């Protein structure tokens, strides 16, 4: 959420962000309700001062033994008007807050202007992408080795679900443990195991609601949602709190299943693991001081990179343009792993700096020093990594001519030293 004062003083910047991110423009509504709110508050202050004055006059009249009925009637009239205006203020606040929640974050000046992923800028490539004649897509590799059962998962649940079988389940579990181990032991994150269900306030705090409600799985007749990412539950752990200054920076990491309807993905990536309604992900979340958040973004990207480097998977990093930046982010990098079957790089991690956008929505502040005014923290998050897509990348990049899959060196301890999946 943007500060209403910022929008009041910079309406054109807020409108520009709406255009750049392809969002509806709510700026005029915000300015209208902001003006109404400030007028009501001014009028309320006048009325409450009058009520206080009349109250003192009533007390003085009674003390002197005079009739105070006229003043009491005046007092009731003023009190009724105050209540009426308080009710009006509540309605205006609700409207103002709704429209504020619909305004996207302002892109950082370093973000390239563009419409979609065609305008993203590749800033780094690591490893040599390989495509050999015998390479098969990961779903065919998995079928030949009896690793992934899409058919029976479809029977149990529906399309875009999968059942991991045998060594695939073990590989998925190994990847989760490996990723968590790297982030905890090498990067100083604190491991969490948060709920997989979040309430409406939490989903609003991180920016999923109200915009993305149609893409969320909502529990029937309840204000609970299956989380689309651990970002929601990790970030909201500190909602409505003032953190001590020495608490920052705070790094959290968690593995959770994630649930998304993928409403806009009809007909895309219909085979394999790339786009599932339920998938596993290791998520990193940071709470940091505002002055250090872009340094922390670079560090976050490096943390996600480290996993790909240890797995020896070819990847590239792209800086997202304004049109592909997302609703809540001020700046975002995508890490994209090489998938031979697609003959391209596919997203495996997004690392974003939200500045104080989420913190303002979720009311997460910190006090730099005792007695100082509380400030909003800056929040960041990044996938570290999407586990199913990592498994797909291993099946494709580590496949052998005989159909077996070599286990990456760093994962062999999780397989009791085995070399291949066969």
Curated annotation (Swiss-Prot):
Its main location: cytoplasm. GO terms for cellular component: cytoplasm. ATP binds at residues 260-262, 347-350. Keywords: Aminoacyl-tRNA synthetase, ATP-binding, Cytoplasm, Ligase, Nucleotide-binding, Protein biosynthesis. InterPro entries: aa-tRNA-synt_IIb, aa-tRNA-synth_II, aa-tRNA-synth_II/BPL/LPL, Ser-tRNA-ligase_type_1, Ser-tRNA-synth_1_N, SerRS_1_N_sf, SerRS_core, tRNA-bd_arm. It holds the Pfam family tRNA-synt_2b. GO terms for molecular function: ATP binding; catalytic activity, acting on a protein; serine-tRNA ligase activity; transferase activity. L-serine binds at residues 229-231, 283, 383. It catalyses: tRNA(Ser) + L-serine + ATP = L-seryl-tRNA(Ser) + AMP + diphosphate + H(+); tRNA(Sec) + L-serine + ATP = L-seryl-tRNA(Sec) + AMP + diphosphate + H(+). Pathway: Aminoacyl-tRNA biosynthesis; selenocysteinyl-tRNA(Sec) biosynthesis; L-seryl-tRNA(Sec) from L-serine and tRNA(Sec): step 1/1. It is found in: Cytoplasm. It is an enzyme of class 6 (ligase). One of its GO terms (biological process) is seryl-tRNA aminoacylation. Coiled coil: none annotated. Its EC number is 6.1.1.11. Homodimer. The tRNA molecule binds across the dimer. Consists of two distinct domains, a catalytic core and a N-terminal extension that is involved in tRNA binding. Catalyzes the attachment of serine to tRNA(Ser). Is also able to aminoacylate tRNA(Sec) with serine, to form the misacylated tRNA L-seryl-tRNA(Sec), which will be further converted into selenocysteinyl-tRNA(Sec). Belongs to the class-II aminoacyl-tRNA synthetase family. Type-1 seryl-tRNA synthetase subfamily. This is Serine--tRNA ligase. It comes from Natranaerobius thermophilus (strain ATCC BAA-1301 / DSM 18059 / JW/NM-WN-LF).
């Amino acid at each position: 959420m943007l500060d209403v004062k910022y929008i009041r003083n910079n309406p054109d910047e807020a409108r520009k962000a709406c255009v750049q991110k392809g969002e509806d423009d709510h700026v005029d509504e915000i300015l209208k309700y902001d003006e109404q709110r400030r007028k009501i508050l001014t009028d309320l202050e006048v009325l409450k001062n009058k009520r206080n004055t009349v109250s003192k006059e009533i007390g003085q009249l009674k003390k002197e033994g005079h009739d105070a009925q006229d003043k009491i009637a005046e007092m009731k009239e003023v009190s009724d008007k105050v209540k009426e205006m308080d009710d009006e203020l509540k309605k205006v606040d609700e409207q103002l807050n709704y429209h504020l929640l619909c305004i996207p974050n302002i892109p950082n000046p370093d973000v390239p202007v563009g419409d979609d992923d065609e305008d993203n800028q590749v800033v780094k490539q690591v490893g040599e992408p390989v495509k050999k004649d015998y390479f098969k897509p990961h779903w065919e590799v998995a079928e030949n080795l009896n690793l992934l059962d899409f058919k029976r998962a479809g029977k149990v649940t529906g399309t875009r679900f999968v059942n991991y079988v045998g060594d695939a389940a073990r590989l998925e579990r190994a990847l989760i443990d490996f990723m968590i181990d790297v982030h905890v032991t090498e990067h100083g994150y604190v491991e969490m195991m948060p709920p997989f269900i979040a309430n409406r306030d939490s989903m609003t705090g991180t920016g999923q609601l109200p915009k993305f409600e149609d893409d969320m799985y909502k529990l029937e007749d309840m204000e609970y949602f299956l989380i689309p990412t651990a970002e929601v539950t990790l970030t909201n752990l500190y909602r409505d709190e003032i953190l001590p200054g020495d608490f920052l920076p705070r790094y959290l990491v968690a593995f959770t299943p994630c649930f998304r309807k993928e409403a806009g993905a009809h007909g895309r990536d219909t085979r394999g693991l790339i786009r599932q309604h339920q998938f596993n992900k290791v998520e990193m979340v940071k709470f940091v001081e505002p002055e250090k958040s872009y340094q922390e973004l670079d560090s976050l990207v490096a943390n996600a990179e480290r996993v790909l480097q240890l797995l020896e998977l070819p990847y590239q990093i792209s800086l997202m343009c304004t049109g592909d930046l997302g609703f809540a982010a001020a700046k975002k990098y995508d890490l994209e792993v090489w998938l031979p079957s697609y003959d391209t790089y596919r997203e495996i991690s997004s690392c974003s700096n939200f500045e104080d956008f989420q913190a303002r929505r979720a009311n997460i502040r910190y006090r730099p020093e005792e007695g100082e005014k509380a400030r909003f923290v800056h929040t960041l998050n990044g996938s570290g990594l999407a586990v199913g897509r990592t498994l797909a990348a291993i099946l494709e990049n580590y496949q052998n001519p005989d159909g077996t899959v070599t286990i990456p060196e760093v994962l062999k301890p999780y397989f009791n030293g085995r070399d291949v999946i066969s």
